[in-house]
Amino acid sequence: MRQNLSRRAACCIVLATLTGSPVYSQDIVIRTKQGTFDDVRFELGNAVIATGVAVQSEGNIASMLGRTAADVGATETVYSHAGFIAFCSAKYSRAMMEADATNIAFCPFTVFIYETKFKPGEIIVGYRRPVVPSNQGTASAKAAADVDALLAKIVAEAVK
């Protein structure tokens, strides 16, 4: 098993080197939109609220990285703008946790947004897919698929 993981990791590194692009897991979904960060961020917030869920928190990742850069000896600016919106849905959260109590790990649900200094005007919006272990059964898989559809809908709405 370790040998297979090592081969897989080596393939990912080679692929990333050859393409010059990061290799993302299929568990991270990203969409791109040209525009201003503030406009797309506004649309993302509206898309979350339109689903009827309660926003629990919002974070400014770019600000946090800037604020802590000196503390960790960082000299690179990763993002021009970056943030997240965390939210809960009584319907979807309950279905996830009724299927398996361990699914609490997926709550709250989070969508992210960022713009890098290298590609101004290219706004990335995305989310991490709620992928449950296969041994959790069909109820967890269905609940996770429903949450995935909700997150996909929010992101699609923000970038249309």
Language model features with spans:
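Mid-chain, structured segments of secreted extracytoplasmic proteins
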Residues: 63-110
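Solvent-exposed, acidic/flexible segments
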Residues: 33-41, 58, 78, 137-140, ...
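Bacterial N-terminal signal peptides that target proteins for export
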Residues: 1-11
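C-terminal partner/receptor-binding element of secreted or periplasmic proteins
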Residues: 125-160
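Bacterial N-terminal signal peptides
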Residues: 10-20
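A short, structured loop/turn motif at beta-sheet edges
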Residues: 114-121
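Terminal, regulation- and interaction-focused segments at domain boundaries
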Residues: 24-52, 57-59
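Sec/Tat-exported extracytoplasmic proteins
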Residues: 44, 51-55, 69, 151, ...
